[in-house]
């Protein structure tokens, strides 16, 4: 298993309860596929450098995980089709 850092931005027009549900859903996607979440950071609502899908703000979430490729691929696939996540990136950390 490798170490990854995952950052994703949740659309700003969701309420707090919906935001928690999105975070929980994507954490479960990783853990059910064998990943171990070592650290989570909620950066809160921040201004974007440029407009994405007509949004100027977003809720930033950062995860540090140890995972196999299949867990990261499944997260990436579902993040791409989710309407709640406006941008995401997965970075493989050097050993």
Curated annotation (Swiss-Prot):
CDD domains documented for this protein: bS6 (cd00473)
A molecular function (GO) term: structural constituent of ribosome
A Pfam family annotated for this UniProt entry: Ribosomal_S6
Domain of life, per lineage: Bacteria
Family matches, as PROSITE patterns: RIBOSOMAL_S6
Any Gene Ontology biological process: translation
One GO location term (cellular component): ribosome
Gene3D superfamilies given in the database record: 3.30.70.60
Keywords from the UniProt entry: Ribonucleoprotein, Ribosomal protein, RNA-binding, rRNA-binding
Family note: Belongs to the bacterial ribosomal protein bS6 family.
Chain's role: Binds together with bS18 to 16S ribosomal RNA.
Cross-referenced NCBIfam families: S6 (TIGR00166)
Name of the protein this chain belongs to: Small ribosomal subunit protein bS6
Species assigned in the record: Bacillus licheniformis (strain ATCC 14580 / DSM 13 / JCM 2505 / CCUG 7422 / NBRC 12200 / NCIMB 9375 / NCTC 10341 / NRRL NRS-1264 / Gibson 46)
């Amino acid at each position: 298993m490798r170490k990854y850092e995952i950052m994703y931005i949740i659309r700003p027009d969701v309420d707090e309860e919906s935001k928690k549900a999105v975070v929980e859903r994507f954490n479960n996607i990783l853990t059910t596929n064998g990943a171990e979440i070592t650290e989570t950071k909620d950066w809160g609502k921040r201004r974007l450098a440029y407009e994405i899908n007509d949004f100027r703000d977003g809720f930033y979430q950062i995860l540090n995980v140890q995972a196999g490729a299949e867990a990261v691929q499944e997260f990436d696939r579902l993040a791409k089709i989710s309407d709640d996540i406006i941008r995401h990136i997965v970075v493989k950390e050097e050993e």
